[in-house]
Amino acid sequence: IFYDAPSCRDNKQNQDEEGIDCGGTSCTYLCSVGVQKPSTRFVRPFAPAAGRTDVIAYIDNPNMNAAAKGGRFTIELYGTDGTVLARKQGTVDLPPASTVPVYVPNFVSGYIEVARAFVSYDEPTFKWFRYTDNRIVPTYNNDAEVTGTTAPRITASLTNPSAKALRDVLVIATVFDSAGNAIAATQTVAPTIPAQGTATVVFIWNEPFSTPPARVDVVPIIPLPSP
């Protein structure tokens, strides 16, 4: 007689699980009925140069103690007649109680008029797990400086609070006007942020902003560990 001990990978609801291989104190992953779905704070297409469209989206995780790693999403761009002009898929890590920017450069090429954008989520790929956020995340010092008008340039700094250098940190910048609307976005990589030190990041555009900038979000992206 062979006995298979209950586990969180046996496709059965056992132990103290609240569903099949989820929930309870035994399993890493939470049941979908116990968590809130991701939502889109906003998604906005831009034309930073003639014949090119970029997209910035802010994705919210409303769950205070749950994270998801590598959840899949789809962004669609629609024309003025309601037809889909372009579609792209991507993945995102959502720390607990977070808003994560997703920037997609050169989403579509060509001289087309984009009326709106939409984000949808492949909900089964958002496998939620309990997580206390202990990642080392550099701090944006809220010191963005905008210079230039025909080819704007933004300089900002990030501080590393840890005793270990951080390397190849993706950083996304989003520019907002006085009404709170996103008017531009781009990204760069900070090669090194020294231990307990500061590094400067620079963001460059080749065309003027559509309206005067009033605020800049600078967000470093640190991947979640695997559960």
Language-model segments: residues:
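Surface-exposed interaction/gating patches
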Residues: G51-A66, P124-A185
